[in-house]
């Protein structure tokens, strides 16, 4: 039997208001960093342990996180992230796991000196026969402040946009083993050229 949740099964994280980026959202994240907030949730038809296990191996994340170029896992708590930014640039930071409970949640924060100060939490809640509700909350400081955030949004590289897309790709990958795309793969292009 699953423990009762204060949230409906498919609801997003409790604190999703951009107006309260420093309030309840930050209160749920140890060592919270960032003034902008985004929160997303998706139900994935897989058991909690499978989803948690895949996500906890941070080297797996570039497989479904479109803007993540690479993640170098340094140890059980520390990893180095390289992420695409607008205008062909990249941003980098070291992230440290600040708190976790196996099969329940992982919280992290960027280390001092990060080009994008950020922190976040991903939660995995049993949804019975429907699988697992995966909720993601991210706090971040966009490079360039509000202007940088607008540019990132225009370039489709803003974390709120990416979080939604990345969770949907995570769902596709875990449920079907692949991520749907409108792009042709090499074999399809060669077949069409023949």
Residue ranges of model-derived segments:
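Hydrophobic ligand-binding cavity/cleft-lining segments
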Residues: 2-78, 164, 169, 173-194
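Hydrophobic-ligand binding "helix-grip"
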Residues: 2-12, 72, 76, 80, ...
């Amino acid at each position: 039997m699953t423990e009762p949740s204060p949230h409906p099964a498919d609801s997003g994280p409790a604190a999703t208001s951009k107006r309260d980026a420093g309030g309840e959202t930050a209160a749920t994240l140890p060592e919270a960093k960032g003034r902008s907030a985004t929160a997303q949730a998706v139900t994935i038809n897989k058991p909690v342990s499978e989803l948690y296990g895949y996500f906890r191996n941070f080297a797996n994340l570039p497989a479904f996180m479109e803007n993540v170029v690479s993640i170098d896992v340094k140890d059980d708590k520390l990893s180095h992230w390289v992420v695409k930014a607008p205008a062909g640039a990249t941003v980098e930071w070291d992230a440290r796991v600040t708190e976790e409970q196996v099969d329940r949640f992982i919280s992290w924060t960027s280390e001092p000196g990060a080009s994008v100060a950020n922190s976040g939490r991903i939660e995995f809640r049993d949804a019975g026969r429907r699988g697992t509700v995966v909720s993601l909350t991210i706090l971040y400081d966009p490079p360039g402040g509000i202007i940088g955030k607008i540019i990132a949004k225009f370039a489709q590289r803003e974390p709120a946009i990416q979080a939604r897309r990345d969770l949907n790709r995570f769902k596709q990958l875990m449920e079907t083993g692949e991520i749907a795309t409108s792009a042709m793969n090499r074999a399809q292009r060669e077949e069409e050229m023949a």
